[in-house]
From Swiss-Prot:
It catalyses: Endonucleolytic cleavage at a junction such as a reciprocal single-stranded crossover between two homologous DNA duplexes (Holliday junction). It comes from Dictyoglomus turgidum (strain DSM 6724 / Z-1310). The lineage of its organism: Bacteria, Pseudomonadati, Dictyoglomota, Dictyoglomia, Dictyoglomales. Keywords: Cytoplasm, DNA damage, DNA recombination, DNA repair, DNA-binding, Endonuclease, Hydrolase, Magnesium, Metal-binding, Nuclease. GO terms for molecular function: crossover junction DNA endonuclease activity; DNA binding; magnesium ion binding. The RuvA-RuvB-RuvC complex processes Holliday junction (HJ) DNA during genetic recombination and DNA repair. Endonuclease that resolves HJ intermediates. Cleaves cruciform DNA by making single-stranded nicks across the HJ at symmetrical positions within the homologous arms, yielding a 5'-phosphate and a 3'-hydroxyl group; requires a central core of homology in the junction. The consensus cleavage sequence is 5'-(A/T)TT(C/G)-3'. Cleavage occurs on the 3'-side of the TT dinucleotide at the point of strand exchange. This is Crossover junction endodeoxyribonuclease RuvC. The gene is ruvC. Binds 2 Mg(2+) ion per subunit.
Length: 158
C-alpha cells in the first residue's frame, strides 16, 4: 500500500510518500513544495495543484492523507491552509484517490502514543520509526510523514 501525506500551506506544503509492504514501512520520497512569496494566491494554488497532480501521477498512491484543519487564532493562516487543502482534495478526487482526513489527536496517539505530544516528540518518533539519520526538514515534511505513519498504523489496528 502506497500512502501520500500532505501538510498543506500556500507557502510550503510538506509531503511524504511511504510504502507499507510485508517487510514494514519504507520511504519512497519526501520533500516540500514551496512557492515564492511574491506570487499571488491564485498562482500559488495553481502551482500546488500541478505539483500535487504530478506526484499522484508519478507514485500512484492508494490513499491521500491530510490533517483536519484545527482551530487557528490567525484567520489568514487558517484560510490559506484551507485553500491549499481544497486544492489537494481536488487533485486527489480528479485522480480518483481515496482521501483520509485525520485529526491531530489521532496522529499524536498513533505516532507517539500520547494525545498531548509536542511537535518535537512527533518529529523524533518519525525519525525513529522511519530509521532516518535526522529529523526531516522543514517541519511540514515531518508532519506529512507522521500523517502517513498514522494512517498505516490505523489500518493495522494499532
Amino acid at each position: 500500500m502506497v500512502v501520500i501525506g500532505f501538510d498543506p500551506g500556500t507557502a510550503i506544503t510538506g509531503y511524504g510518500i511511504l510504502n507499507k509492504g510485508e517487510d514494514g514501512i519504507s520511504i519512497i520520497e519526501y520533500g516540500a513544495l514551496t512557492t515564492p512569496s511574491g506570487w499571488g494566491i491564485g498562482r500559488r494554488l495553481n502551482y500546488l495543484f500541478d505539483q500535487v497532480s504530478s506526484l499522484l501521477d508519478l507514485y500512484n498512491p492508494d490513499v491521500v492523507v491530510m490533517e483536519n484543519i484545527f482551530f487557528n487564532k490567525n484567520i489568514k493562516t487558517a484560510i490559506n491552509i484551507g485553500q491549499a487543502q481544497g486544492v489537494i482534495i481536488l487533485a486527489a478526487e480528479q485522480h480518483q484517490k481515496e482521501i483520509s482526513i485525520l485529526t491531530p489527536l489521532e496522529v499524536k496517539l498513533s505516532v507517539v502514543g500520547y494525545g498531548r505530544a509536542t511537535k518535537n516528540q512527533i518529529q523524533y518518533m518519525v525519525k525513529e520509526i522511519l530509521k532516518l539519520k535526522d529529523i526531516p526538514k522543514p517541519d511540514d515534511v515531518a508532519d506529512a510523514l507522521a500523517l502517513c505513519i498514522s494512517y498505516i498504523y490505523k489500518q493495522e489496528g494499532c
